[in-house]
Structure formats: structure tokens, C-alpha cells
Amino acid sequence: MQTNNPSYFFRSESALQDEKRKEEKSHNPNGNPRNLKAKILNIELDRTTPKKKQFPRLFVCEASHICKLYDLEINKTCKTYKGHSGPVTCCQIESLRKDGKVRHIYTGSWDHTIKKWNVSTGECVETLIGHTDYVKCLLLLEEEGLLLSGSTDASLIVWDVSSQPSRLLYKLTGHSRGIECITRQPNTDIFWTCGSESSIRCWHITKVGGSQLEEEGFWGHQSNVYCLLFDPQDSEALWTASADKTVREWSLYQGIHEETRMEHPDVCTDVLTLADGNIATACRDEEIRVWDTTTGNVKDIYSGHYESVTKILQWKSYLISSSLDQTIRVWDLEYSADNNEADDHPSLGPPSTKLTAEELAELEELMND
């Protein structure tokens, strides 16, 4: 292949072919894509969305340094939370307040900080400083008035967000590398974390103190673990998604269930339990898979994204996905993947980005870690 474009001189043939493939795939209408014009790192449901709406509102964490409240039904940004100096990786949102008090959203960022925002006005109320590297995950415990944060600095911080201002209560260490995800074991004060190592660690955390339960935890993955999720239909079952190209189910008392080891062709980025008891998974190969948990086989593959899928959520009968390709797509689970391939949707133009070349390289390195 010959070219006069200087930007192509030091790129491999395979890289150029992949870029061409992605450019061609970027015009596909599958999943009715909403192009948000920035790489999407995370999404969370706005659980105050009225049930009568067909599609929900989402809080969207972007590499463009902002978080936004986006209405999928009208394809419109309702509010923007702007103030971070780095990509926003995660967010947690307070429930609808019945006491008349202001509702808040917490966001974590590459700028090492957590910010608290007024959901309605978009005003930044305060900035929580304590981590020394990227903040990668948050977990809000509203009843206890606590916020847990995990970071690339390998620490887990417990914050008292019921006080004014919020206070750093204590910091827990034990991971050898960054923390990617925190989840709570149902009906307990036990929490599980994973990250840029193969181990899954267990902690006892309360407002007065916390510690690692070193005799607990799981060691079975061969690489980074990106997601942890307890099965709502079985509180003793923990699902994990890993860079070793597998999604696995663990029993808290029996260890790994080899029969539910789900093999993928690339890094697994997310796992979701569906209302019907099946499992959905997101992968760096750009696909979303729905698995039959009784057989361990793939039921459907939803294809449309042209970069790594970063998050999947369920709303009613719809599966919602976000991607580094800057789009959010909606898939109807009541129909097969083939019936989610539209042929009358207007094509999208090539994506744009607000990141510098250095930030893009850092983002790609982080996502591929």
C-alpha cells in the first residue's frame, strides 16, 4: 500500500487495515447509535427516570473530562457536569430525595479527585482529595453515608459523605496494583474488589473501620479483572470479567464454577445479569454477547460498535451499551441480534475527539492494560 500522507509513514499495514475497517463499520446503524462526540468510559442509569418512558436518562462519563446527564428518549444532553481536568471514569448518584434535600452525583477522574455535584444545577459542591493516581471506581452507600473509592494508586478510601464537608475516614491497602471495581456482598458489610492483577480481594468495611479479610478472596484469573457483580438471584454467586478473555462465576463457599467459564476472543470488559436469569458480556472485540446460563452457550451476539465496549446496562427489555467509539446503542432483548440490525437509520459521520494525542495514547494504554 502506497500513500503520501505523512501520518501513515510509520504505521503497519495491519494498523492501516484496522483503521479502514473501523471507519467503514462506523457508519453501521445497528443498535440505533447515539453519537456523543467523545469516548465513553462509563454509563449509569438515572433511576429517577419515569417508568412510563421507553428509554431512560443516563449519566455518561466521558474522556472529554465531563460527565453529562443524557436523555436517550429525546437524544439530548440535559445537564453537563464540567470541572475535572482529566477523563471521568466513574460516577455514583444519590436516590431521589424524599426529604426535599438536593440530590447529588459523585464523579471520579484521572485528575486524582472525586467531585460532588448538584444534579439539578450542575454546580460542583466540593472536591474530595486523597488519591495520588487515577480514580477508577466509586461505590455509594447511602444508608451509611459512606462513599468508597478505588484508584490506580492501589488504595481503597472510605469517605464520610454525610458530614459537611465530606471527610476521609481511612485508607485501605492490600492490592499490589490499581483497583478497577468495588461491589458489596448483599446484606453484609463485606466488600469485594478487583483490578490490574489476577486476584479478587475481600474486605470488611464500616464507618468506624475496615480491614482486608486475607483468608478470603479468589485467585483463578490469569490477568486483570475489570468487573465484579453479585447475582441478584443468588447472593452467593459472584460474576467476574477479566483481561484473560473469560467471564467466570464463583461460589463464595466453593470457589470457581468451571462449567460457567465463558470464553471470549478478547479482553472482557463488563458482565451483567439479565432479568431473565441469563448473562450479558461486553468485550474488547466490539461485540456484546448474551449467554444461556443453563447451558453456558451463547444465545445472541449484538454487533455494531467499532471500538471496545465499555459498559452494558438493562432497562426494561432493552440492553444499553457504551463504547470507546463514542456511541451509545440500544438493543431490544425481545428480538434476536439479527432483528436489531437496522437498514433505514441515517449513517453516522466519522467520530471526533477532544483528547490530545498524548491523552489518546494514555487512554489506549490504560484500556489495554
UniProtKB/Swiss-Prot annotation:
Record CDD domains: WD40
Region (Disordered) residue spans: 1-35
Keyword Acyltransferase (UniProt): no
Keywords: Repeat, WD repeat
One of the Pfam families matching this protein, by short name: WD40
A single Gene Ontology CC term: cytosol
The protein, known as: Uncharacterized WD repeat-containing protein C126.01c
The keyword Cytoplasm is annotated on this UniProt entry: no
Gene3D superfamilies for the chain: YVTN repeat-like/Quinoprotein amine dehydrogenase
Organism (species): Schizosaccharomyces pombe (strain 972 / ATCC 24843) (Fission yeast)
Compositional bias annotation for Basic and acidic residues: 17-27
WD repeat boundaries on the chain: 83-127, 130-169, 174-213, 220-260, 263-301, 304-341
SMART domains: WD40
